[in-house]
Structures are given as structure tokens and as C-alpha cells.
């Protein structure tokens, strides 16, 4: 594989990285929404509101699931930051 072919291949990979990086705002919004939902559910639980949900067995179970989703999203943000650095390196290589 010659240098031109390598640069073409890395250019294609750079496009994939760019698409992944574009998700950053959506992931951040998802975290924000999840945190707001936790606050709401904790308020409902504290106020003694009846639990009416067929998916989760309790407010605590629902809140715990959302906390896990937040951790996953935070991990995704960390990966996106790494991909930004990786993309920058690739762009310098193919320039």
C-alpha cells in the first residue's frame, strides 16, 4: 500500500470519526434530560405519589436505570473526546 492509498483510507476513517463526533451535542442533551428526569422522579417519590409504571417495579429501580444510562453517556462523551484527538492527528497526516 503506497502513501496515497494510506491517506485515502485514513480519509475515509476520518469521515467516520466526524460522524461520531457530531453526536456529542445529542449525548450531552440526553444526559441533561436524564438528570432532569431523576430530579422529577425523586420529587414524585418524596411526595409519596403513587407509582404507576409497568416497566419498572419502583421509583428506585427506575432512577437506578437512569443513573446507569447517564454513566454510559458520560463514557460516550469521553470516547468522543478521544476521537477528536484522533481525528486531529489523522487530518495532520493526510494534509
What name fits each language-model region?
Residues 23-28, 61-94:
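Amphipathic alpha-helical coiled-coil segments
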Residues 13-14, 32, 45-48, 74-75, ...:
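Short, flexible coil/linker elements and helix-boundary hinge sites characteristic
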Residues 3, 7-8, 16-17, 46, ...:
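N-terminal cationic leader/targeting segments used for protein routing and processing
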Residues 1-36:
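Short, charge/polar-rich alpha-helical segments
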Residues 11, 19, 39, 43, ...:
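Generic detector of low-complexity/intrinsically disordered segments
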Residues 24-63:
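Extended alpha-helical coiled-coil "stalk/arm" regions
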Residues 4, 21, 47, 55, ...:
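N-terminal compositionally biased, intrinsically disordered segments and leader/signal-like regions
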Amino acid at each position: 500500500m503506497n502513501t496515497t492509498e494510506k491517506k485515502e483510507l485514513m480519509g475515509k476513517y476520518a469521515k467516520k470519526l466526524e460522524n461520531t463526533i457530531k453526536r456529542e451535542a445529542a449525548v450531552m442533551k440526553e444526559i441533561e434530560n436524564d438528570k432532569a428526569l431523576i430530579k422529577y422522579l425523586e420529587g414524585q417519590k418524596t411526595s409519596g405519589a403513587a407509582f404507576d409504571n409497568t416497566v419498572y417495579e419502583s421509583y428506585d429501580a427506575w432512577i437506578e436505570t437512569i443513573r446507569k444510562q447517564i454513566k454510559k453517556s458520560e463514557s460516550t462523551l469521553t470516547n468522543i473526546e478521544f476521537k477528536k484527538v484522533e481525528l486531529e492527528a489523522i487530518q495532520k497526516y493526510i494534509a
